[in-house]
């Protein structure tokens, strides 16, 4: 692999010999709540195989950047990344500063553009699953659907 272009919480991106491609290395680094916790043997390989499975399973729905892989290294088409992470939540739970319950317990009723009612209890099942997007950066910040569009992460079309 050539020069490293980016080192994230879990993945590293390297130049490829072909300027239209990149290498994405999924490491064994375990990250939680925007912090590196430890290394977990074979985590990178397993995550890469899950990605390969999902890219292949969904390519008939939407094109993706996947070309090939060897162990924990993907070869991908160079493209512009979509720096939004989507979390699907079925319960109002958690105990960290980033958890839905922590925000709710501190009085936040509009989270990621979703209005939550009063009187929810910790660990309560939500009436229906909700999607709570966050920015993908050093620190993941909650963002609403409207802000995703207004900040030009994506268009409405």
Model-derived regions, located:
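Active-site loop/lid in soluble adenylation, ligation, and acyl-transfer enzymes
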Residues: 1-137
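A short mid-domain helix/strand-loop element embedded in enzyme catalytic domains
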Residues: 126-157
